[in-house]
């Protein structure tokens, strides 16, 4: 069966709005594990043993580096039950694979271990998404198929997630269940939620496993993002500038899941770290007890932003388009508010949440209520609130405000009165929320506020503008009320802290950070944290590199038949790449 996606009006409307759960299974659908379905494995038994070997060594190495332990008296069965409850929200964390849902090839597992051994000493060159070998050809449809292990309803939901990726990027997907060779994605139900990262470099099929608990649009979009080349957000080389990993709170056998990627392997295309990414772990992922944080955000008000599995963030989409679609539109539009030229419609901009219009020049109108808009502030207080406050708002209502202070002023925002927005308290995660974007780039996900009790934070903008978003996806509630005003851009910051050490020695592969604080009572403008690329000189000298050599294959049958295989070997050789992915060499320096 061949099928090329076209844009269906109803599906587009559903997909563009939000990747939410759908209703219960259709009664006519057969069980997902229907008899007669061909059983598959994510990889061969021999390859699995190799990967398990290196993953075990990785966990032991991480445990040696971070030996902190917290002793608690808790029934192991209760701990297992807590994790089973967690799987409802983030089922991809419960898998047996690397970081829960990433299926590594043997050479990848070995390279990860070698990187961990030599961290900060030797550059180990590897071919992950930073290499074109694992990127799909955006000029051709990506072939996908089902192996028969999903019901018709489950297939429809999976295709809706693909349709969403299709609508927001230049990528096209084509179904072909009869294809038996070449690169293609095969959806199966073989082992929880799991996928490889990027295209198979040898032109073979790759499995994306989606068990019944994974059939949610947000989780499917997450796994498809892996197949298209995305790693987890908190694995970025620069993550320590945004979050702190609480090693002492991580389950003993899971510390290897929090290793960072080598800068050589990841091309972030200049897109900043994204707390709201659908690829980010939640706050308590892989914790040894359900009340312990394993990831703490550097700015505490971002804590409830991380870990969502509802929708692709604007920066998730922007990164995918930068990697695959940057050449689609011959000319770029003068997009505002962090927008960029839409590769699906080159005559319009793709806008961050809260903005619309050809150039993102308009504030998005309210949905399900008359609310939001652009408000020009003065020094007098202006109040904004959820629809109907203090009465309860309704499920599905959305409001967007752009608060603008006059020149020489910034925006001051503070919650007042009763506050209630639906959240998952155990997971420290907002389901419905008020989001405040106060940075210099409105493309970045902001701080999300939810749960019960009025947030005490007094928020000030980095510029004359601030965006406030009210989103009620799941249920009604009391909502919020806040006051905003323009305050003079007065008072100075305290001095910057010293720069942190650069995370890499050359090639523009590293970054560094410094911070500053605003004294109480001052209305400081600008950002409290600054990061920059560092050590941009070209890499020279010797690097640990992967080389292919012909040798005897492993396995009894291969030895018996005398089969020869191409094998990887790590050797010291002159560095192949002078610059990290996304940078080019110009006059001895690596520039973007």
Curated annotation (Swiss-Prot):
Residues 490-540 form the TSP type-1 domain. Transmembrane segments: none annotated. Disulfide bonds join 170-325, 193-214, 371-399, 502-534, 506-539, 518-524. It comes from the Eukaryota. It is found in: Secreted. Residues 127-326 form the Peptidase M12A domain. GO terms for cellular component: extracellular region. The gene is dpy-31. Residues 1-18 form the signal peptide. Its main location: secreted. Coiled coil: none annotated. One of its GO terms (biological process) is proteolysis. Expressed in hypodermis, rectal and vulval epithelial cells and amphid socket cells. CDD domains: CUB, ZnMc_astacin_like. This is Zinc metalloproteinase dpy-31.
């Amino acid at each position: 069966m061949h099928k090329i996606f076209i844009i269906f009006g109803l599906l587009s409307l559903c997909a563009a709005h939000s990747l939410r759960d759908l209703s219960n299974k259709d009664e006519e659908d057969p069980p997902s594990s229907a008899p007669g379905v061909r059983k598959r494995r994510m990889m061969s038994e021999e390859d699995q043993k190799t990967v398990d070997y290196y993953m075990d060594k990785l966990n032991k190495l991480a445990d040696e580096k971070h030996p902190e332990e917290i002793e608690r008296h808790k029934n192991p069965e209760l701990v297992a039950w807590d994790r089973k409850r967690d799987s409802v929200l983030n089922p991809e964390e419960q898998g047996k694979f690397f970081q829960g849902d990433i299926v590594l090839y043997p050479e990848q597992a070995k390279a990860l271990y070698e990187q961990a051994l030599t961290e900060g000493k030797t550059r180990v060159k590897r071919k992950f998404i930073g290499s074109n070998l694992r990127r799909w050809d955006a000029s051709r449809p990506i072939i996908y198929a089902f192996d028969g292990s999903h019901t018709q309803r489950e297939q429809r939901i999976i295709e809706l997630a693909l349709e969403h990726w299709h609508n927001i990027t230049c990528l096209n997907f084509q179904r072909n269940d009869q294809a038996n060779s070449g690169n293609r994605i095969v959806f199966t139900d073989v082992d929880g939620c799991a996928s490889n990262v990027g295209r198979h470099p040898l032109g073979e099929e790759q499995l994306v496993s989606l068990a019944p608990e994974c059939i949610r649009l947000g989780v499917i979009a997450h796994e498809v993002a892996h197949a298209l080349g995305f790693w987890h957000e908190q694995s970025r080389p620069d993550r320590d500038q945004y979050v702190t990993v609480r090693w002492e709170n991580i389950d003993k056998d899971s510390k290897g899941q929090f290793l960072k990627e080598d800068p050589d392997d990841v091309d972030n295309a200049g897109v900043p770290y994204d707390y709201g990414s659908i690829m980010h772990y939640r706050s308590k992922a892989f914790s040894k007890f359900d009340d312990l944080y394993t990831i703490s955000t550097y700015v505490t008000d971002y804590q409830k932003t991380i870990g969502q599995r509802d929708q692709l963030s604007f920066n998730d989409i922007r990164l995918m388009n930068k990697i695959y679609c940057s050449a689609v539109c011959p000319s770029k539009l003068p997009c505002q508010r962090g927008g960029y030229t839409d590769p699906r419609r080159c005559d319009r901009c793709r806008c961050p949440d809260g903005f619309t219009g050809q150039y993102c020049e308009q504030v998005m109108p309210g949905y399900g209520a008359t609310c939001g808009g652009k408000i020009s502030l003065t020094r007098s207080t202006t109040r904004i609130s959820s629809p109907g406050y203090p009465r309860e708002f309704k499920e599905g209502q959305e409001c967007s405000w752009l608060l603008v202070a006059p020149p020489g002023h910034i925006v001051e925002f503070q919650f007042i009165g009763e506050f209630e927005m639906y959240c998952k308290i155990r997971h420290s995660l907002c389901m419905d929320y008020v989001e405040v974007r106060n940075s210099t780039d409105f493309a970045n996900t902001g701080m999300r506020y939810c749960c019960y009790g009025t947030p005490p934070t007094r928020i000030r903008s980095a510029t004359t503008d601030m965006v406030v978003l009210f989103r009620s996806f799941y249920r009604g509630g009391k909502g919020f009320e806040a006051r905003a005003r323009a305050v003079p851009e007065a008072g100075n910051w305290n001095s910057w802290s010293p720069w942190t050490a650069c995370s890499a020695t050359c090639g523009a592969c590293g970054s560094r950070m410094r911070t500053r604080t605003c004294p109480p009572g001052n209305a400081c403008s600008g950002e409290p944290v600054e990061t920059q690329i560092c050590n941009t000189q070209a890499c020279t000298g010797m690097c640990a590199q992967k080389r292919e050599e012909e040798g005897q294959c492993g396995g009894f049958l291969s030895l018996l038949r005398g089969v020869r295989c191409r094998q990887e070997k790590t050797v010291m050789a002159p560095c192949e790449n002078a610059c990290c992915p996304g940078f080019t060499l110009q006059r001895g320096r690596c520039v973007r």
